[in-house]
């Protein structure tokens, strides 16, 4: 059964935002895109690269036009747009939202790194990123955030279109999370941020939370008994690491 579609009017503020997003072709800057400047891209010093990223992030003036940093299509952003369009179409029945949702899903499927990794998975970033801890991310480094959001996007689209390919791709990505990112043989089981990090020294808690959200969404679509204990372990990790004041 397809998702129920109603015909409620869209608030004017959402229509304005939708038009702005479409007119800008979903392109945007990112707060960590400083190294995407052709003027700065070849800098090798780790500390200087981090300084550039942070200066670009916190500068009160948008320096990107002067640094010739171009806007890009962000995978995670497109996954979130897909989820928003699915919700808007289900609420309003407006075919424009359905069209944009399908275009966004097409982009997601095209950006899959399955040929490289063996599973459908995605890199969040469209630009090189260097962390203070010397960690790096690239267009060819699949990560848990982009992959989890893509899974949720594909599931939300599948609920409307019943396109079996979307369900198959989501299922493949679930296998990537479980087989490549889940660390179970430790005192506190967790999901790694990237598969390339063979021996993570720290647990990135939002990585486990994102994976739990994606797997739970898939479980609602098609329950798998083998995923249940993984969800429970990830949930226990989040509960175990919560501070007394409720924060993480």
Label for each model-derived stretch:
Residues 1-248:
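Glycan-recognition and catalytic cores of secretory/periplasmic carbohydrate-active enzymes
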């Amino acid at each position: 059964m397809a998702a129920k579609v109603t015909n409620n009017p869209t608030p004017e503020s959402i229509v304005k935002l939708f038009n702005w997003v479409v007119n800008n072709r979903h392109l945007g800057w990112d707060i960590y895109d400083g190294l995407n400047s052709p003027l700065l891209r070849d800098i090798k010093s780790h500390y200087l690269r981090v300084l550039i990223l942070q200066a670009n992030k916190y500068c009160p003036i948008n320096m990107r036009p002067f640094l010739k940093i171009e806007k890009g299509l962000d995978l995670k952003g497109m996954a979130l747009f897909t989820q928003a369009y699915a919700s808007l179409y289900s609420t309003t029945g407006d075919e424009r939202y359905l069209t944009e949702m399908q275009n966004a899903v097409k982009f997601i499927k095209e950006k899959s790194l399955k040929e490289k990794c063996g599973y459908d998975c995605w890199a969040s970033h469209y630009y090189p990123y260097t962390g203070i801890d010397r960690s790096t991310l690239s267009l060819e480094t699949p990560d848990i955030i982009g992959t989890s959001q893509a899974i949720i996007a594909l599931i939300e689209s599948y609920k409307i279109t019943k396109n079996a390919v979307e369900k198959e791709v989501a299922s493949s990505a679930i296998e990537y999370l479980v087989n490549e990112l889940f660390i179970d043989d430790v005192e506190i089981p967790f999901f790694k941020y990237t598969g390339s990090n063979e021996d993570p020294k720290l647990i990135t808690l939002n990585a486990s939370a994102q994976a739990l959200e994606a797997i739970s969404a898939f479980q609602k679509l098609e329950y798998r008994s083998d995923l249940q204990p993984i969800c429970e372990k990830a949930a226990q990790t989040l509960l175990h690491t919560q501070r007394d004041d409720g924060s993480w």
